[in-house]
Amino acid sequence: MLEIKSIPAFNDNYIWLIQNSDKRCAVVDPGDAKPVLEYLQANELTLEAILITHHHNDHIGGVSDLVRAFPHVSVVGPKAEPIPTLTNAMEEGDKLELFGEIFMVLGLPGHTLGHIGYVGDGKLFCGDVLFSAGCGRIFEGTPEQMFESLSKIMKLPEETEVFCAHEYTASNVAFALAVEPDNEHLRQYRDDVNRLRGLNIPTIPTTLRKEKLINPFLRATNAEVIQSVTNRIENSDPCSVFTALREWKNEF
């Protein structure tokens, strides 16, 4: 079992550090090199791999400096996106061996067209596709693509730990409660999130099991969720409900 640590960056990013038992590690989506280098030095760790989910600068901005500090590091990322530092270009179905664990690459377009995720060891690193109680904005893809990406994630085991790249949970929960004000799981989660954030403790990782109970973007077949967007849709199929939710969240 790999050990995962969060390295905060910018206002609300999480850079995930994946560590094995002999001081070797990888990082996921290092938008800023400085906090990573400080953590590596303080803990006497050697960086062996960088995993990238998509090309936005708050996810890749620190890669060049990390490569300079660790010239032999592998840089793994999406084949379909313009990331010049890649040494290993990956796409749906590819496999990655990381400290004795096999990670599968998932194609997760929507937020960006080439966005990928990494799933293995009971963990999903999903960048900006799925957040706790929310999902990413659709910048390059279509609502249909994002819906399919989330549907793909939904098929993973429910105990899968979800490591997304931002601490957006409190604002996401506020929206989720506007969608489902009577959801008791959400009300309890709001209290849990407020307590954790009051102590400056991350709300991430979450689990897929929890998200299926509280995340409106994964609940497009739920009657209360459908009812909440009735005045925004002509058809109540799950993708139309999801699309209406995403448009509502954009203006929330």
From Swiss-Prot:
Native source species: Vibrio campbellii (strain ATCC BAA-1116)
Taxonomic path: Bacteria, Pseudomonadati, Pseudomonadota, Gammaproteobacteria, Vibrionales
Pathway(s) per entry: Secondary metabolite metabolism; methylglyoxal degradation; (R)-lactate from methylglyoxal: step 2/2
Annotated residues for binding of Zn(2+) 1: 54, 56, 111, 128
Gene3D superfamilies given in the database record: Ribonuclease Z/Hydroxyacylglutathione hydrolase-like
Pfam families, per database record: HAGH_C (PF16123), Lactamase_B (PF00753)
Quaternary organization: Monomer.
GO biological process terms, semicolon-separated: methylglyoxal catabolic process to D-lactate via S-lactoyl-glutathione
Keyword vocabulary terms for this entry: Hydrolase, Metal-binding, Zinc
Cofactor binding note: Binds 2 Zn(2+) ions per subunit.
Alphabetized NCBIfam families for the sequence: GSH_gloB
Cited InterPro entries: Clx_II_MBL, Glyoxalase_II_hydrolase, HAGH_C, Hydroxyacylglutathione_Hdrlase, Metallo-B-lactamas, RibonucZ/Hydroxyglut_hydro
This enzyme's EC code(s): 3.1.2.6
Signal peptide: none
Residues that, per the record, bind Zn(2+) 2: 58-59, 128, 166
Cofactor: Zn(2+)
Function: Thiolesterase that catalyzes the hydrolysis of S-D-lactoyl-glutathione to form glutathione and D-lactic acid.
Example of a GO MF term: metal ion binding
Protein name per UniProt: Hydroxyacylglutathione hydrolase
EC top class, as a word: hydrolase
Family: Belongs to the metallo-beta-lactamase superfamily. Glyoxalase II family.
